[in-house]
Amino acid sequence: MVVGLFGGSFNPPHEGHALVAEIAIKRLGLDQLWWMVTPGNPLKSRNLLAPLAERIAESERVAADPRIKVTAFEQALGVSYTANTLARVKARNPHVHFIWIMGADSLQTFHKWQKWQEIARTFPIAVIDRPGATLSYLSSKMTRTFDFARIDEDDARVLWKKPAPAWTFIHGPRSGLSSTAIRNGALPGAVG
């Protein structure tokens, strides 16, 4: 089984997140995508963070595809930081092939994540295009560090077979929705 792991605050979740999930399922040939709602992000302020239960419920409404499973692994496992969560999820599911899914907009700060290089050396990574990040991903520390491990997006369906580090950038439809803009009132409605 091939499973995409798509983590984030989802504060609030919106159709742009659902689009990233759908692109990942289609282009990577995923059997499932686990939408991992985090209790909090150490790189973001918690002042405007909606309660976890609310973000999970909203994520379930947005993620209409039955192959998408909304989870709260970090809370359930009692861990924080993506690297720790992913290590525990992998240890509990040794026969599953995982791919870490991230929006291209997250690449500019990925090198600030705890153990970011360990994540890249443990999981193949699929970076999904986001507005404003189509070219900026080229200058990210992750893509420069692991440039040798990039596979062509035409081979995205076999990314799960590649030993990490391996990553691809996937172009496709993009949504201009942004959780930050929705919270700031610049864009309407969080849920789809």
Swiss-Prot record:
Catalyzes the reversible adenylation of nicotinate mononucleotide (NaMN) to nicotinic acid adenine dinucleotide (NaAD). Its EC number is 2.7.7.18. GO terms for molecular function: ATP binding; nicotinate-nucleotide adenylyltransferase activity. It is an enzyme of class 2 (transferase). It catalyses: nicotinate beta-D-ribonucleotide + ATP + H(+) = deamido-NAD(+) + diphosphate. Disulfide bonds: none annotated. Pfam families: CTP_transf_like. HAMAP family: NaMN_adenylyltr. The keyword ATP-binding applies. Keywords: ATP-binding, NAD, Nucleotide-binding, Nucleotidyltransferase, Pyridine nucleotide biosynthesis, Transferase. Belongs to the NadD family. This is Probable nicotinate-nucleotide adenylyltransferase. One of its GO terms (biological process) is NAD biosynthetic process. It comes from the Bacteria. Pathway: Cofactor biosynthesis; NAD(+) biosynthesis; deamido-NAD(+) from nicotinate D-ribonucleotide: step 1/1. InterPro entries: Cyt_trans-like (IPR004821), NadD/NMNAT (IPR005248), Rossmann-like_a/b/a_fold (IPR014729).
